[in-house]
């Protein structure tokens, strides 16, 4: 129902408009208070890059974060990542991830980023505290924040917004009548707009998610997606239909598709009930970080990577590299650039 309301297919959004106006007023006042200096903005002696959304729901933000971290690491820069840690509940914050950290503590996305990149990752409700914790523990050149576009207490140097190219902004209204955290005009103030799927408009950077071979949760074996049939597909992400569409685009039609809520907490018995003996369970990589501890031999996940046009790489990275150079000794910065 909420998807129909947000897409504009249902007129029921009218009933929620009073709450949306209130949401919009509050968020505008919060941003205004930071811009006027009435609230403290925490700044740090290195570049902060925010990769965020204007809308609620999955837009492909985390693959962009993974791409950015990898690009900076390949150039020799020391990258840290901070996150709110949605879906996690740690005993204390800020929490620095290590080999003993679970998704129950830090959330699924931070754990996925840590496992994929090896970059130091910290989570905290106040992202500035997460940045401070990273800097106490590591020598870093740049920090990337996974989400947090609307977390104005954290000063930032670069802002990227990721948009779902098919859904874009839905009916255009603020939460809860629509999907918007901020209005579309906010795009005029960011350094890059990256569009996941669909058609990018002038000035936007097109991106697509490319699936790799499926990976077994227990053994790490990699196999071609088509060789896994029959498949039961599950997705506990912001927009499950995108995952199922990726499977069909890869030539696989699952015998069943089961959509869960974002940051779903799984149990072995729950997933066992979905799969017959001859079937294989296929999930997103984000789901896999929560299921690996109790996985079965027939459970697989599908990693995806952000693919951007070759010409966009330089345009996206140059402002970040310049910001790093400004914050580092000239010789050190030029050596890495």
Swiss-Prot record:
Q: Which domain of life is it from?
A: Bacteria
Xref: Pfam families: LpxK
Q: In which pathway does it act?
A: Glycolipid biosynthesis; lipid IV(A) biosynthesis; lipid IV(A) from (3R)-3-hydroxytetradecanoyl-[acyl-carrier-protein] and UDP-N-acetyl-alpha-D-glucosamine: step 6/6
Reactions that this protein is recorded to catalyse: a lipid A disaccharide + ATP = a lipid IVA + ADP + H(+)
Alphabetized UniProt keyword annotations: ATP-binding, Kinase, Lipid A biosynthesis, Lipid biosynthesis, Lipid metabolism, Nucleotide-binding, Transferase
Q: Which GO terms describe its molecular function?
A: ATP binding; tetraacyldisaccharide 4'-kinase activity
EC identifiers of the protein: 2.7.1.130
> Do the record's keywords include RNA-binding?
no
GO-annotated cellular components: plasma membrane
> So where does ATP get bound?
55-62
Q: Write out the coiled-coil annotation as residue ranges.
A: none
- Role this protein plays: Transfers the gamma-phosphate of ATP to the 4'-position of a tetraacyldisaccharide 1-phosphate intermediate (termed DS-1-P) to form tetraacyldisaccharide 1,4'-bis-phosphate (lipid IVA).
Q: Which family does it belong to?
A: Belongs to the LpxK family.
The record's NCBIfam families line, in alphabetical order, gives: lpxK
User: Which protein are we looking at?
Assistant: Tetraacyldisaccharide 4'-kinase
User: Could you read off the lineage of the organism from its UniProt record?
Assistant: Bacteria, Pseudomonadati, Pseudomonadota, Gammaproteobacteria, Enterobacterales
């Amino acid at each position: 129902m909420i998807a129909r309301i947000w897409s504009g297919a249902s007129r029921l959004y009218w009933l929620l408009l009073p709450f949306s106006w209130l949401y919009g007023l509050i968020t505008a006042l919060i941003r205004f208070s930071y811009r006027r200096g009435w609230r403290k903005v925490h700044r740090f002696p290195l570049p902060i890059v925010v990769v965020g959304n204007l809308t609620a729901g999955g837009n492909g933000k985390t693959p962009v974060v993974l791409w950015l971290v990898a690009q900076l690491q390949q150039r020799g820069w020391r990258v840290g990542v901070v996150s709110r840690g949605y879906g996690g509940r740690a005993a204390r914050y800020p929490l620095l991830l290590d080999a003993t950290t679970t998704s129950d503590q830090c959330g699924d996305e931070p754990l996925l980023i840590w496992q994929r990149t090896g970059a130091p990752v910290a989570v905290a409700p106040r992202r500035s505290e997460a940045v401070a914790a990273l800097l106490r523990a590591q020598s870093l050149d740049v920090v990337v924040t996974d989400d947090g576009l609307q977390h104005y207490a954290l000063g930032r140097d670069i802002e990227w917004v990721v948009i779902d190219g098919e859904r874009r902004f839905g009916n255009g209204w603020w939460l809860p009548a629509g999907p918007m955290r901020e209005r579309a005009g906010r795009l005029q103030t960011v350094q890059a707009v990256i569009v996941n799927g669909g058609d990018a408009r002038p000035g936007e950077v097109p991106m697509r998610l490319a699936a790799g071979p499926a990976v077994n949760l227990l053994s790490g074996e990699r196999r071609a997606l088509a060789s896994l049939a029959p498949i039961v597909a599950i997705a506990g992400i912001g927009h499950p239909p995108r995952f199922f569409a990726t499977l069909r685009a890869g030539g696989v039609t699952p015998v069943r598709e089961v959509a869960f809520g974002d940051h779903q907490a799984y149990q072995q018995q729950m997933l066992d009930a979905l799969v017959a003996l001859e079937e294989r369970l296929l999930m997103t990589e984000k789901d896999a970080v929560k299921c690996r501890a109790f996985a079965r031999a027939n459970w697989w996940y599908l990693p995806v990577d952000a693919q951007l046009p070759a010409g966009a790489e330089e345009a996206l990275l140059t402002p970040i590299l310049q910001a790093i150079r400004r914050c580092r000794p000239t010789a050190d910065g030029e050596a890495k650039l």
